[in-house]
Amino acid sequence: MKLIASNKKAYFDYEILETLEAGLVLLGSEVKALRQTRVNLKDNFVKIIKGEAFLFGVHISYLDTIHAYYKPNERRERKLLLHKKQLLKWQIEASKERLSIVGLKLYFNQRNRAKIQIALVKGKKLHDKRQNLKEKALNKEILADLKHHFKG
């Protein structure tokens, strides 16, 4: 698995409940851009429209060598390839419990197919985010103290 991009902000902003791997319908130039890691997953989300999942907000830059006549929209919606049962299950859960679906990681699998790891998420409150930051700072401080203690 070759990791192309990761949505680190999603791990901070959301509580991840369940993850799933999905295929992407891409153009040839977009695949080439992915191989050069010219992608940004920040602020992406998944919408289910008429029984099909679409990924919105992913920015895939076009290549410099591409012809001026053919420049696709960099932020266009991209269709996700999922099993129907899984899609219906997530659609019901998301609508019933007011959850969202976001993309976490974009990568090439062993067969060199572009895949995205999507997650069913619940938004964190501000105090939850503050608590996470405090825990991270405390853990970092403890590790630094331990390192200093064992060194000298």
Swiss-Prot record:
Function: Required for rescue of stalled ribosomes mediated by trans-translation. Binds to transfer-messenger RNA (tmRNA), required for stable association of tmRNA with ribosomes. tmRNA and SmpB together mimic tRNA shape, replacing the anticodon stem-loop with SmpB. tmRNA is encoded by the ssrA gene; the 2 termini fold to resemble tRNA(Ala) and it encodes a 'tag peptide', a short internal open reading frame. During trans-translation Ala-aminoacylated tmRNA acts like a tRNA, entering the A-site of stalled ribosomes, displacing the stalled mRNA.
RNA-binding found in the keyword field: yes
Any one cellular-component term (Gene Ontology): cytosol
Name of protein: SsrA-binding protein
Family: Belongs to the SmpB family.
Keywords: Cytoplasm, RNA-binding
SUPFAM superfamilies the record matches: Small protein B (SmpB) (SSF74982)
UniProt-recorded Gene Ontology molecular function terms: RNA binding
One biological process term in Gene Ontology: trans-translation
Subcellular location(s) per record: Cytoplasm
Main location: cytoplasm
InterPro entries assigned to the protein according to its UniProt record, in alphabetical order: SmpB (IPR023620), SsrA-bd_prot (IPR000037), SsrA-bd_prot_CS (IPR020081)
Source organism of the structure: Helicobacter acinonychis (strain Sheeba)
